[in-house]
């Protein structure tokens, strides 16, 4: 990912060939800040929701696309099953199966989604929301994966998949992933800033247009507001 001097995302660079060798030191990652692993989980979780909405809209699916779809589902399933165990390993500083599963999922399985799926297995709505948020200076302290995790929920609102949002909320709460602008300390963003974010998320080059339907700034703005209202009601209900 390339950013400008102000911290706004400019573009993704996709290389013609992949790494010849990748070495992973699980013990080194075990000793890293936990919030980085949580952000990595949020980013990898998007693999399923972005690949799924794109691949399901294809009239036919080649074998490599089917592999990408399978790997994307494995990302979601592994993250939902093993994240709690992995974070416990970091707290105790003791390797366990769940930690290794999460590391392999974030790096290896996640890489397979885009590796086999190419444009159909990389980004859709969630990453467009991330990209747009980077233009706001107030977001620059937030980790990439946290903004992407928020973007997943905005994408699901656009898809009108509130049932899936409800499924994810306990997981988000457990890991501390943001469920709203409020959770990211952005509740006071001005209306004109939200409008600018929505316009940026739907620029012609953005991957949100890989989703079926017409993706306009109004669609994104309304989804962000609906999500914010829903999460505010849940906070009041507590």
Model-identified regions with their sequence ranges:
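A glycine/threonine-rich phosphate-anchoring loop and its flanking beta-alpha core
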Residues: 1-68
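Short hydrophobic "helix-edge" motifs at membrane interfaces and signal-peptide entry regions
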Residues: 15-16, 116-118, 206-207
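A short secondary-structure junction motif
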Residues: 48, 52-56, 86, 109, ...
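Active-site segments that bind and position negatively charged phosphate/pyrophosphate groups
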Residues: 61-174
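C-terminal charged capping/lid subdomain of soluble metabolic enzymes
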Residues: 161-238
């Amino acid at each position: 990912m390339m950013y400008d001097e102000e911290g706004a995302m400019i573009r993704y660079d996709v290389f013609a060939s992949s790494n010849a060798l990748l070495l992973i030191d699980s013990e080194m990652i075990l000793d890293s800040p936990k919030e980085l692993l949580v952000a990595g989980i949020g980013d990898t979780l998007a693999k399923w929701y972005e690949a799924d909405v794109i691949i399901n809209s294809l009239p036919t699916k080649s074998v490599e696309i089917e592999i990408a779809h399978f790997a994307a589902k494995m990302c979601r399933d592994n993250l939902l099953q093993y994240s709690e165990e992995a974070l416990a390993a970091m707290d105790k500083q003791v390797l366990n199966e769940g930690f290794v599963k999460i590391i392999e999922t974030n790096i290896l399985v996640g890489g397979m989604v885009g590796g086999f799926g190419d444009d159909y297995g990389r980004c859709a709505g969630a990453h467009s929301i991330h990209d747009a948020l980077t233009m706001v200076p107030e977001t620059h302290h937030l980790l990439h994966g946290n903004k992407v995790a928020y973007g997943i929920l905005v994408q699901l609102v656009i898809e009108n998949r509130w049932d899936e949002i409800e499924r994810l909320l306990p997981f988000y709460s457990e890991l501390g992933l943001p469920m709203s602008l409020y959770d990211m300390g952005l509740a006071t963003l001005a209306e004109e800033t939200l409008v600018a974010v929505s316009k940026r998320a739907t620029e012609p080059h953005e991957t949100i247009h890989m989703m079926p339907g017409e993706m306009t700034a109004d669609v994104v703005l309304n989804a962000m507001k609906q999500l914010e209202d829903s999460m505010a009601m849940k906070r009041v209900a507590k």
